[in-house]
Structure formats: C-alpha cells, structure tokens
Amino acid sequence: MTESEFLKQAEATLDQIEASLEDLADTSDLDVECTRSGNVLEIEFIDNGSKIIVNSQAPMQELWVAAKSGGFHFKATGTQWINTRDGAELFAALSEMVSKQGGIPVVLQDAN
C-alpha cells in the first residue's frame, strides 16, 4: 500500500470511529467526548476521566491504540484493521475497550 493510500484509509477509519462514538453518545448512556487533532483521535470518558487514544503511524502503516488495557497496533488487511499480536479486528477490540472504560456495553460499527 502506498503512503497516500494508507493515509486515506486511516483517515476514513478515524472518521468512522468518531462518528460511531458520537452516535452512541446520542443514543445511549455512554458519556464520551471525542477530540481530533490531525492523525490523533482522543476519546475521553467524562464520568471517570480516562482516555483512549487512536492514532495513525504512517511510517509503520499501522493504527495504534492506547487504552487502560494496554497498547495495541493494528495493520490494514484489505478493508479491516487487524491486531498484529492476537488477530483481533479494530472495531471489535475498540468496542471491548470502550465498554470496559465507559462502564456500559457498546458495539462500534464499521461502515465497511
């Protein structure tokens, strides 16, 4: 994948994560605030002040996630982002992380 293809896919994925979280905040008891700065998406949980950070790493062609449960690297395989350690899909993994840190079960939707 070229760098421009990676950046386009990473940008679309960050946009989708943010949109999915905003939809959940509007339709559930999930109280989060998303802040975007370039290739970094910061998800802040208002109730407890914890955060999840998702950012793209162009040199590695990966999305990195930092959460209470640890740090994770996801590599694009077709239209999905797969954890380089355990093979988990990004949106499924983020759903679990957001559920744990937010205190309510949520499912983030991937538009693909």
Swiss-Prot record:
One of its GO terms (molecular function) is ferric iron binding. SUPFAM superfamilies: Frataxin/Nqo15-like. Keywords: Iron, Metal-binding. One of its GO terms (cellular component) is cytoplasm. It holds the Pfam family Frataxin_Cyay. GO terms for biological process: iron-sulfur cluster assembly. InterPro entries: CyaY, Frataxin/CyaY, Frataxin/CyaY_sf, Frataxin_CS. Involved in iron-sulfur (Fe-S) cluster assembly. May act as a regulator of Fe-S biogenesis. HAMAP family: CyaY. Belongs to the frataxin family. This is Iron-sulfur cluster assembly protein CyaY. It comes from Janthinobacterium sp. (strain Marseille).
